[in-house]
Amino acid sequence: MKKVLAAALCGAVMFLLPGCGGERLPYAREMGDMALMRTMGVDTGEGGAEQLHVTVSSGRRARGLQGEAEPPLVLSAERESISSAFLAMQGLSDSYVFYGHVDQLLLGEELSRRGILETLQYFSQDQELGMGTQVWIVRGGTAAEAISAEQERGVESRLSTIQTDSEMGMAGMTRTVGETLTSLMEDGSAYLPGLVPGEDGALLEAGYGVVKDGMLAGWLTGEQARGLELAAEQVGADILELETRGGGAAVRVTAVSVSCVPEFSGERLTGLELACRRSLRAEESWGEPEPAELCAAAEERETARISAALEQLKGWNADCLGLARRAGQMESARWNALRAQWPEVFPELEIQVTVQASLLAA
């Protein structure tokens, strides 16, 4: 019996050796020569709605003993699924392509208008990709173009800078895959930051794309984008230049809080009060402006911004700010009634916006 077992084991080992047995094992790349992909872009393919064009970029890489920087490795493939595109790109590189370090996801506008749920759900199901990946929509263009525009320097560096600036209150809001899926599940809609390539190829912030039922409904830009940030309690990268009778000042928002109070007639939702409190700090001033007048000017400007954003969201019937949930927290006993009525009443709901600003002492 021992001789039979030994013979079987010997045969198995011989089968696995190169040149022995019916087939060889696949050639194993050197794991030291690994391409760590950092950014992924997804667009609709040229082959039609059933095709996806997937682009990945590694960022600048270090090679050799001196760690010389090499240009990013950019690969792309068009297939019917992301997983099949990944497999196809594996064969396009001499390095082992590893997707577990992808932390930036770019979505083309055409794909976003057709639907992004399948792409986001792939990140939630794949073992290598993560829910903490940052998501962006390329406004008026494709993800492949955005990645190629920054190919020399690497798009990863620019996206990481915007993300860091956002955390420091020096850029707009960012969203992760997990946050976006949660908003779509709980609120039926979500906002995602937009990007456009600048004249020198560097990616620039371009407002927010509002996604409803998994598809891009439209864009909030300019004053509407600033209003969205305020209503979301985000301290954005914005300087308000205010004029009063005695002079003016450039002020920055340092803190913001928002309460959302529903108004009922019986069990019928009739209105919503959105109250915003803001703390301001004067960065510079000219003349002799009165603090009270500066606060009043800021309140008027910010009320108009928030109202403009809300009117557009009502037009799309897209509650990407989670106003229903926030109002339900104030009236938990009426949450079921509020949730049932919300999709019907939100487009015509009267929302009263009030802003109270306070100027911090210099």
Q: Can you describe what each PLM-predicted range is?
A:
Residues 2-362:
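Membrane-proximal alpha-helical signals and transmembrane carboxylates
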